[in-house]
């Protein structure tokens, strides 16, 4: 059906309700380089056409409302409205469509991820004409992207700060996540760091509870870091979680981390919010702190294939808001993760120029305009047998974040850390020598066991541990 357009400034106002597609479905529209583009997966209600649904999404996420209003005549509607410019069916799915929508850049506040998401996804997901709606991808134009500071430092600066090159980084989340005293917590940190890990981490649940107040934890962790650094000669760190109930308290904790001289802090960016995260990122940039970002609550938003927001969008907006690390799943571990989709979003976290690649779920090319890179963190149910696959999938510019795969070693935390480090270095060396990690990964680990009793013990404990479940959200 040919598009119908209407200029409110030249047409006499008529009260009433009219179809969204009259104004907001514009298949002849030529996308501008300054437009923010969005790809939505739509599932219309029975009897509702995809054109009407796509137009409704464009309207409700920009200038439209459910009825004609006379104040439309006081502005240039054609200048400010969102436009559904293309709709395509989803292959293999019944009654699902991808709607492509263009938004004028004037609709968004500069440097505000909060405003961007409030506009695009803030209200339209509850629209009754849709059974389900999912934001699959965004294209951020260069002129808008340049209003964001992005990550505090980025991968290259982080490696310079740590003086660590040519291999992936290793971390460990301290377990049990809740219940330890600050002193015992610090002891666990020390054992992991002296064994060969680069980082240890507060779990996202750990903030400042009665059994371990934040100030005590910070002190004992700093003591562990300095002791391990002195013994190993390597720079070490612990992700001190500064997430708090208000921003004033968050800054107080970050200030204390600066006074202690530690290299990195942590924030839960979804539960803490984008406004707090952007503010904390700016603080870290100004005070020389690295910022580790945890994605607690993400699966509530991104796991269902038909409704919500894909993680690639969350990763994109986090790179704009700011962070040096971001948890990104593992594919092979205990958490949800599709291999092709994971390739797509770890590339957009690290690279400067991303090309459209529907095989990896990337709907739009994206030029990051030199914005600093974001290091993926592979975390969740991983152990030494996973190391070849992890290195093959993620490459060197990644932090491999163990938990039980370090602390569950039969000889203790330090031995678990040794096993992790030996496995990583063995796989890195084999890859550098031209061996296929996919084909020979298990053989590489077995060969390394001959030279490390700690790795051999770890391999024996976890030789039959797998997480073979079907992926809910896959391409």
UniProtKB/Swiss-Prot annotation:
Transmembrane segments: none annotated. PROSITE patterns: RUBISCO_LARGE (PS00157). One of its GO terms (molecular function) is ribulose-bisphosphate carboxylase activity. Keywords: Calvin cycle, Carbon dioxide fixation, Disulfide bond, Lyase, Magnesium, Metal-binding, Methylation, Monooxygenase, Oxidoreductase, Photorespiration, Plastid. GO terms for cellular component: plastid. Its cofactor is Mg(2+). Mg(2+) binds at residues 201, 203-204. Substrate binds at residues 123, 173, 177, 295, 327, 379. Its EC number is 4.1.1.39. The active site is at 175 (proton acceptor), 294 (proton acceptor). The modification N6-carboxylysine is found at residue 201. GO terms for biological process: carbon fixation; photorespiration. It is found in: Plastid. The disulfide bond which can form in the large chain dimeric partners within the hexadecamer appears to be associated with oxidative stress and protein turnover. The record marks 334 as: Transition state stabilizer. It comes from the Eukaryota. The basic functional RuBisCO is composed of a large chain homodimer in a 'head-to-tail' conformation. In form I RuBisCO this homodimer is arranged in a barrel-like tetramer with the small subunits forming a tetrameric 'cap' on each end of the 'barrel'. Heterohexadecamer of 8 large chains and 8 small chains; disulfide-linked. The disulfide link is formed within the large subunit homodimers. Belongs to the RuBisCO large chain family. Type I subfamily. RuBisCO catalyzes two reactions: the carboxylation of D-ribulose 1,5-bisphosphate, the primary event in carbon dioxide fixation, as well as the oxidative fragmentation of the pentose substrate in the photorespiration process. Both reactions occur simultaneously and in competition at the same active site. This is Ribulose bisphosphate carboxylase large chain. It comes from Euglena longa (Euglenophycean alga).
């Amino acid at each position: 059906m040919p598009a119908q357009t209407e200029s409110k400034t030249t047409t006499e106002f008529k009260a009433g309700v009219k179809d969204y597609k009259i104004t907001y479905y514009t298949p002849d529209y030529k996308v501008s380089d300054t437009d923010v583009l969005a790809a939505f997966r739509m599932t219309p209600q029975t009897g509702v056409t995809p054109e009407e649904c796509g137009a409704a999404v464009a309207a409700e996420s920009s200038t439209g409302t459910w009825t004609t209003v006379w104040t439309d005549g006081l502005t240039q509607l054609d200048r400010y409205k969102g436009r559904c410019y293309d709709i395509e069916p989803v292959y293999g799915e019944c009654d699902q469509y991808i709607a492509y929508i263009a938004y004028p850049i004037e609709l968004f506040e500069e440097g505000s991820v909060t405003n961007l998401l409030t506009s695009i996804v803030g209200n339209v997901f509850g629209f009754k004409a849709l059974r389900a709606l999912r934001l699959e991808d965004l294209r951020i134009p260069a002129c808008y992207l340049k209003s964001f500071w992005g990550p505090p430092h980025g991968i290259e600066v982080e490696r310079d700060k740590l003086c660590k090159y040519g291999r992936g980084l290793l971390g460990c989340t301290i377990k049990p996540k809740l219940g330890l005293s600050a002193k015992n917590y610090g002891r666990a940190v020390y054992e992991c760091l002296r064994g060969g890990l680069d980082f240890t981490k507060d779990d996202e649940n750990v903030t400042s509870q009665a059994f371990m107040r934040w100030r005590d934890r910070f002190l004992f962790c700093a003591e562990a870091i300095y002791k391990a650094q002195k013994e190993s000669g390597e720079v070490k760190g612990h992700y001190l979680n500064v997430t708090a109930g208000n921003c004033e308290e968050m800054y107080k904790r970050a200030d204390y981390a600066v006074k202690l001289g530690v290299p990195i802090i942590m924030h839960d960016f979804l539960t803490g919010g984008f406004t707090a995260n952007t503010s904390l990122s700016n603080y870290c940039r100004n005070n020389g702190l690295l910022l580790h970002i945890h994605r607690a609550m993400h699966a509530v938003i991104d796991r269902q294939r038909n409704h919500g927001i894909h993680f690639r969008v969350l990763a994109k907006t986090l790179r704009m808001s700011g962070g040096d690390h971001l948890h990104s799943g593992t594919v092979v571990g205990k958490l949800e993760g599709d291999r092709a989709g994971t390739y797509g979003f770890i590339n957009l976290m690290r690279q400067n120029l991303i090309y459209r690649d529907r095989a990896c779920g990337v709907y739009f090319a994206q030029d990051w305009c030199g914005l600093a890179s974001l290091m993926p963190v592979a975390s969740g149910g991983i152990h030494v047998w996973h190391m070849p696959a992890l290195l093959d999938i993620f490459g060197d510019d990644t932090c491999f974040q163990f938990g039980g795969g370090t602390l569950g070693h039969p000889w203790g935390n330090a031995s678990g850390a040794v096993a992790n480090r030996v496995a990583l270095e063995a796989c890195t060396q084999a890859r550098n020598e031209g061996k296929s990690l996919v084909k020979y990964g298990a053989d590489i680990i077995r060969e390394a066991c001959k030279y490390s009793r700690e790795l051999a013990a770890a391999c024996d404990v976890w030789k039959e541990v797998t997480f073979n479940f079907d992926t809910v959200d896959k391409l």
